């Protein structure tokens, strides 16, 4: 078996740090705002590595087992949506978990049945953006349009599939190609920004050409940078964050919302970034230690059925927004620490031959 490429964990780790910068729920000006805009491309790195890890699973997993798992991944993932929007409207918006599910399944089908050559992945990635940019807004409303095309907010199929496909290309291409792509996209970004920069061009949901160029620059730049390192220290905190990036996703957001609720948003922004990062790192260690005592209870379908029902039911029966956030955060963290058990259960239910547990779509080892 090919040795695991730790650069994937490193890329996920840096995207975790960028998430903290991007998700502080305050609006800043000057240098801090520039950092926030650039950090907003963190999902691009998430999705890119998810595309890569999917291709590594094609020969080891059946589509049926992936389909069952990612349907539940998307549903339980609404816990994350509900932390941002603690009401039933959250079910109408595509966020990180839902687009990961769609992106992973799409890459799997593409890789397994079409086996496109390397550069076709790049062309398909750009074609996805072209469909978003030139076709999506011209179409009339139709059922599930908010899943396929961006309307207001959310990570819809077009244009965000581009990052999954682009990640596969970046991983398989030589590092020289990654450097060239970084320089070309960065140069084009400078050219299109020469006449002035409008912040409206950097709203990630309704992806513009400047935002695409920024995303490509960061995506290929990250693959170029982290693949230059031949080895990583096992105890590297960046790898730890990348390895447990799904848990990081829920933990950091819960802490950001909690600190904001406590009024800590008045602190200097750099102090808030550091506070959230340290508390997230420590909190993940505590949660994973505690999970050793409860993981065994999630090796059966019944507790997972309870988790799925709870994610959906909480905003329907609980009127208090803070309590919704707390309960959905707990459910999301529980899922993030124990998704392997669910993956194994889904594999066993589809095939009598027990398949290996699914690697974390947002950064676990394969």
What are the residue ranges of the model-derived segments?
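Alpha-helical transmembrane segments and their immediate juxtamembrane cytosolic regions
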Residues: 1-366
């Amino acid at each position: 078996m090919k040795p695991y490429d730790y650069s994937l964990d490193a890329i996920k780790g840096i995207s975790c740090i960028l998430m903290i910068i991007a998700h502080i729920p305050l609006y800043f000006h000057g240098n801090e705002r520039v950092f926030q805009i650039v950090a907003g491309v963190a999902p691009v790195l998430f999705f890119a590595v998810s595309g890569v890890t999917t291709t590594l699973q094609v020969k080891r997993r059946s589509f049926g087992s992936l389909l069952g798992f990612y349907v539940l991944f998307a549903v339980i993932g609404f816990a994350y949506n509900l932390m941002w929007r603690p009401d039933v409207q959250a079910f109408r918006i595509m966020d990180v978990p839902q687009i990961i599910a769609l992106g992973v399944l799409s890459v799997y089908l593409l890789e397994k049945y079409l086996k496109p050559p390397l550069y076709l992945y790049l062309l398909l990635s750009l074609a996805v953006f072209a469909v978003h940019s030139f076709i999506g807004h011209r179409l009339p409303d139709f059922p599930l349009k908010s899943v396929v095309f961006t309307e207001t907010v959310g990570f819809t199929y077009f244009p965000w599939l581009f990052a999954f496909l682009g990640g596969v290309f970046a991983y398989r291409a030589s590092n020289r190609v990654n450097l060239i792509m970084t320089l070309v996209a960065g140069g084009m970004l400078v050219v299109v920004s020469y006449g002035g920069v409008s912040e409206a061009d950097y709203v990630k949901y309704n992806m513009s050409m400047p935002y695409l160029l920024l995303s490509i620059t960061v995506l290929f730049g990250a693959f170029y940078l982290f693949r230059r390192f031949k080895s990583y220290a096992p105890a590297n905190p960046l790898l730890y964050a990348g390895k447990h990036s799904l848990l990081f996703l829920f933990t950091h957001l819960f802490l950001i919302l909690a600190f904001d609720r406590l009024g800590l948003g008045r602190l200097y922004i750099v102090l808030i970034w550091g506070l959230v990062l340290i508390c997230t790192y420590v909190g993940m260690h505590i949660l994973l230690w505690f999970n050793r005592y409860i993981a065994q209870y999630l090796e059966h379908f019944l507790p997972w059925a309870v988790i799925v029902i709870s994610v959906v039911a909480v905003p329907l029966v609980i009127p208090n927004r803070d309590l919704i956030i707390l309960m959905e955060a707990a459910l999301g963290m529980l899922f993030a620490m124990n998704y392997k058990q669910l993956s194994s259960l889904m594999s066993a239910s589809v095939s009598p031959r027990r398949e290996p547990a699914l690697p974390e779509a947002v950064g676990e080892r394969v």
